């Protein structure tokens, strides 16, 4: 029986090095699957030291690939972190620097026994600046995005259908993604004849309220539905046409909710003394029981999905020519009843999501490509999400992307990343490095700069300096002892920050 209904919407720098790809590839371009999970901390995986949570498939990926220890998200929160991937710009330059919402103060529409927003989404990517899917389309790649978009609101100039994406299924809006049993999901599918993003209504879910005990009578679980759509898309691919898939899972972001199956039950038995949480309706977080079991189950469920992706690639004979990346958009959260201290989710780093301390931005990052990326390798190269655009361009053979795609008519346009393809392919001597890495986030009024072992965090205009080699937890501010380093990093901030009318930050005194 068909359970979903569709409705249509209207809405209010570096030069690439393609020779790095191994000669045995010849003309064939590699496929790329970029798996981005949501709010996973540096210490959430067994291969990064997590003692409680079972992640056998991701651990195997690490054993067969390269695990990075100093990889950084683009921002300590979702939308701007994703923006740095898509735009190749850090948060001092990219247009989207925060989770600006577009569902506030819009009319409501009825879904069964519920009301929901008529328009949802976040600040759009600047349509004058090229993003990754558009570059891949120009190179002849098939493009798919499955999960969270967060790069434009419904009807805006930056929805998947307008930004080089062939197939999209998931959440246009990250706020909507707080419900794992939603009223609707978004879809754009050329193969189904869509000409714009549509809403696919979850007919079974909307029979029950969005909040309260009856919410858990809903059965259409978005994480599984989105994952199945991704598997269907991979199943349609072949060795004759290169493809790139952005699998942007919402797990393990709050709310803490999932099917009552063996994954959850195993953790309920493991954590005998567990917590409950009362819910937060205005954030769309329903109440949760067994919060430790719920959270652990969400990560193991994600790990199961990763295993199914690898199985599908092998079944299709695509595994040897597919680069797979696994990472997280930012550090761990404590919303919805999550308990990062219990799990040691920060990996012994200071700070959580929304903070420019290490715990908010240092993330797990694993790269896998048989016969190209050295199995079982661990790498301490320092890089950030805005380096992924040049990296992917190198791997895909997109030549001179910065020169080709910089919009000379857009003031200040350009790209900030450096390709890490040499590192991935074992050519360390050819790897270029940043002088420093840069972050800023307006909600907590913080700026972060890292140069080598030195790390500056500016909080409400006040600089704090740490030496990560001796103080990984960022406990000891040594700014007064090293004025020359402070001066150097302040100069970096002055150079890298470009004012934004929507995302304002307090700059330090220069």
Residue ranges and their predicted role:
Residues 23, 42-131, 135-141, 155, ...:
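Active-site segment of extracytoplasmic enzymes that catalyze sulfate/phosphate-ester chemistry
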Residues 27-30, 37-53, 60, 69, ...:
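Active-site-proximal cap/lid insertion segments
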Residues 1-28:
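Bacterial Sec-dependent N-terminal signal peptides
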Residues 449-452:
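Active-site beta-strand termini and strand-to-loop segments that position acidic
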Residues 74, 125, 353-358, 411, ...:
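Short Gly/Pro-enriched turn/cap motifs at secondary-structure boundaries
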Residues 408-429:
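Acidic, glycine-rich loop-and-strand cores that form catalytic or ligand-binding grooves
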Residues 132, 148, 388, 420:
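Short active-site alpha-helical segment characteristic of glycosyltransferases
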């Amino acid at each position: 029986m068909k359970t979903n209904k569709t409705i249509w919407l209207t809405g209010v720098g570096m030069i690439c090095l393609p020779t790095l790809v191994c000669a045995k590839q010849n003309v064939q371009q590699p496929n790329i699957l970029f798996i981005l999970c949501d709010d996973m901390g540096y210490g959430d995986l067994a291969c990064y030291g997590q003692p409680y949570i079972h992640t056998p498939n991701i651990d195997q990926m690490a054993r067969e690939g390269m695990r990075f220890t100093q990889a950084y998200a683009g921002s300590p929160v979702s939308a701007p972190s994703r923006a740095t991937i898509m735009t190749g710009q850090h948060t001092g330059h990219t247009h989207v620097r925060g989770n600006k919402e577009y569902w506030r103060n819009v009319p409501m529409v009825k879904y069964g026994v519920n009301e929901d927003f008529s328009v949802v989404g976040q600040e759009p990517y600047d349509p004058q600046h090229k993003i990754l899917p558009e570059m891949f389309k120009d190179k002849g790649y098939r493009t798919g995005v499955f999960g969270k978009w967060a790069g434009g609101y419904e009807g805006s100039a930056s929805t998947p259908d307008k930004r080089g994406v062939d197939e999209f299924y998931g959440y246009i809006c990250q706020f909507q993604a707080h419900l794992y049993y939603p009223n609707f999901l978004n879809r754009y599918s050329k193969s189904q004849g869509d000409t714009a993003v549509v809403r696919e209504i979850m007919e079974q879910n909307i029979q029950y309220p969005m909040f309260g005990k009856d919410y858990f009578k809903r059965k259409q679980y978005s994480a599984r539905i989105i994952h199945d759509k991704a598997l269907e898309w991979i199943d349609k691919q072949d060795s004759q046409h290169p493809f790139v898939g952005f699998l942007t899972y919402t797990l393990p972001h709050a709310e803490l909710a999932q099917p009552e199956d063996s994954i959850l039950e195993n953790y309920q038995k493991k954590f005998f003394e567990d917590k409950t949480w009362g819910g937060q309706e205005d954030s769309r977080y329903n109440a949760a029981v067994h919060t430790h079991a719920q959270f652990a189950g969400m990560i193991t469920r994600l790990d199961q999905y990763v295993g199914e992706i690898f199985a599908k690639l092998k079944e299709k004979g695509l595994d040897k020519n597919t680069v797979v990346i696994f990472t997280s958009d930012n550090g761990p959260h404590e919303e919805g009843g999550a308990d990062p201290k219990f799990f040691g989710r920060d990996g012994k780093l200071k700070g959580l999501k929304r903070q420019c301390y290490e715990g908010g931005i240092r993330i797990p990052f694993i790269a896998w490509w048989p016969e190209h990326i050295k199995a079982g390798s661990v790498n301490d190269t320092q890089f950030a999400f805005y380096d992924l655009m040049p990296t992917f361009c190198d791997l895909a053979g997109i030549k001179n992307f910065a020169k080709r795609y910089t919009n000379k008519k857009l003031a200040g346009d350009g790209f900030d990343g450096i390709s890490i393809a040499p590192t991935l392919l074992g050519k360390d001597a050819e790897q270029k490095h940043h002088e420093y890495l840069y972050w800023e986030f307006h909600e907590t009024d913080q700026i972060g700069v890292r140069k080598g072992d030195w790390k500056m965090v500016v909080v409400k205009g006040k600089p704090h300096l740490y030496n990560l080699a001796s103080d990984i937890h960022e406990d000891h501010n040594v700014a007064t002892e090293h004025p020359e380093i402070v001066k150097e990093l302040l100069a970096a901030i002055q150079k890298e920050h470009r004012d934004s009318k929507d995302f304002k930050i307090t700059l330090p005194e220069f």
